[in-house]
Amino acid sequence: MDYSTRPDARILYDTLVPIWPDRGSALSYRNCFELLIAVILSAQCTDEQVNKVTPALFEAYPTPGDLAEASLADVESLVRTTGFFRAKAANIVGAATIIARDLGGTVPDTIEELVKLPGVGRKTANLIVSVCFGKPGIVVDTHVLRTARRLGLAPTDDPGKS
């Protein structure tokens, strides 16, 4: 069944949009590259904490090429307070390296290309294609998926199949 055309899904959508018309991100960013890096850093961290870290990070490394050339130790020290800082530093340097080296410095505009980047899963990819490129994409975390499943709007708890 195509869940996007269910009448109850439309009712839910039509009810929620007026309540939350501005569904933008709480993360601070100036371009798609900054949003991508901020979203990677936001895993298991509050947007508020990410917003405290990113100004210094983007001042030091404003482009994918700059971040790709950064020492891992320097990036780790800048993102330390976001938790899991070693993995996050490796992921953002890795993503920046691929973007700079293989993609001409441009953030990919498809989910398929985005999920190839270190630290990027479907949730992050959907957010980027939706916010940056205006393409349809629904950002679904475990809480949204669980609620959608309980409401009968999602057929499974598997995010890849919902």
Question: How would you describe each model-predicted region?
Answer:
Residues 2-162:
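Catalytic cores of DNA base-excision repair glycosylases
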